[in-house]
């Protein structure tokens, strides 16, 4: 049975009594964001709004984006990536569980040196696919051309963010490539792998909020 969104107490400065708000709103106030489902337009718009809203409040405070996603809509993922590059605070990305397809694309888009994966996380990269298989020949050809353009764009971003040659990324993304956290670090999708004993671990950001 679904338990719904948990609620936690929150007290504004100067207030005596706490109010109960859902846990995501509480964490959003601490700039802790979550990509924990398939990427779609609605989720992308929500995350972009949350990233933009505090943009002028305190530029010195990083944002933390926790990623556990099987991927999803290509343009929605690209829009999240682009927003991360243009907000003033650094966006740290943390992979918990799985970052696949557009999930790994967003993960790689975090601030260089601030992209982290938990020790048992998995990362998967591949080329974008098309779900359009029926229709007139002309429409299929136009879509195929668009898919190739998108693939070229995504391949270039992966190459830029990982430091790998473009031809290597192009060959690797011909198929689904699953990696461990350590392998993702070697490939360049992330930077450090989180250490369980570290007092500054990604999860400690949650417990200190």
From Swiss-Prot:
InterPro entries attached to this UniProt entry: ClpP, ClpP/crotonase-like_dom_sf, ClpP/TepA, ClpP_His_AS, ClpP_Ser_AS
Signal sequence range: none
Protein keywords: Chloroplast, Hydrolase, Plastid, Protease, Serine protease
Superkingdom of this protein's organism: Eukaryota
Role, per record: Cleaves peptides in various proteins in a process that requires ATP hydrolysis. Has a chymotrypsin-like activity. Plays a major role in the degradation of misfolded proteins.
Self-association state and partner proteins as the record states: Component of the chloroplastic Clp protease core complex.
Protein name per its UniProtKB record: ATP-dependent Clp protease proteolytic subunit
Source organism of this protein record: Huperzia lucidula
Lineage of source species: Eukaryota, Viridiplantae, Streptophyta, Embryophyta, Tracheophyta
The gene coding this protein: clpP
